[in-house]
Regions:
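Conserved, mostly hydrophobic/aromatic
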Residues: 109
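Active-site microenvironments that recognize anionic phosphate/pyrophosphate groups
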Residues: 1-84, 91, 98, 103, ...
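Histidine-centered nuclease catalytic patch
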Residues: 106
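Phosphate-group recognition and catalysis centered on beta-loop-alpha active-site segments
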Residues: 112
Length: 226
């Protein structure tokens, strides 16, 4: 994760005056001509450009930017995040809030890296898999609540504000996520609480339904760090 050139991104000024004075580097017209992209369409025809991160901290580090200039805000976009995770199960999709590490808070974007690179992911996967195999909740996970097929846990092995969400469907994951976000403290001058979010899709072995083999069964997993 050593990339000295990343200081241009991580130390970028993100105050209102600085953002207005610079050209947005995520807008298509301001990107280098050699930077190509793939397209991804989210819900309600929201379109994204999938880009190689020019200042990576991971191998195969991606930026998934809206194809229009719109502020960084997770509202109404959680299902886009889960769809990205399901379509690309070998990646973890992550979101930095506008005041929580996003170097372009004026242009909405997710990021992605190969799943399993972060120790937190591996430990949470291990604990969830253990819980599902044994039927018992590990010490690291404290059950909080459920919404439909989605479950919320507090993760106790890191800082205090780490929550784990699991769900079988994108819709229930989004419902539970927004209920959790509604409980977080928020400053009056901010558009959303301060948090970072990881999301990935855990594929399950193919199952037979009405005699037909389906490989679509799996589980959405997310981690919110507040």
């Amino acid at each position: 994760q050593h990339n000295p050139a990343r200081i241009r991104s991580s130390a970028a000024k993100v105050d209102k005056a600085s953002l207005q004075a610079r050209k947005c580097f995520l807008c298509a017209e301001n990107r280098p001509p050699e930077q190509r992209h793939l397209e991804f369409e989210g819900r309600k025809e929201r379109k994204y450009d999938v880009l190689i991160n020019p200042y990576p901290i991971f191998p195969n580090h991606l930026v998934i930017a809206r194809n229009i200039h719109t502020p960084q805000s997770i509202w109404h976009r959680m299902t886009d995040m889960t769809d990205l995770a399901r379509h690309h199960p070998s990646f973890t999709i992550f979101y930095n809030g506008p005041k929580c590490g996003a170097s372009a808070p004026d242009h909405f974007h997710f990021q992605a890296c190969p799943h399993g690179l972060m120790p937190l992911e591996a430990d949470i996967d291990k604990n969830i898999d253990l819980m599902q195999a044994s039927g018992e909740t590990p010490e690291a996970l404290d059950y909080v609540t459920s919404v439909q097929d989605a479950n919320l846990y507090h993760y106790g092995k890191f800082t205090r504000g780490v929550f784990v969400l699991t769900a079988r469907t994108s819709k229930s994951m989004a419902k539970l996520f927004y209920r959790l976000v509604d409980c977080l403290p928020q400053r009056e001058d901010e558009t959303e609480p301060m948090f970072n979010l990881l999301c990935w899709y855990r594929k399950s072995p193919s199952q037979k339904l009405l005699g037909i083999s389906h490989g679509r069964f799996g589980e959405y997993r997310a981690v919110l760090l507040a």
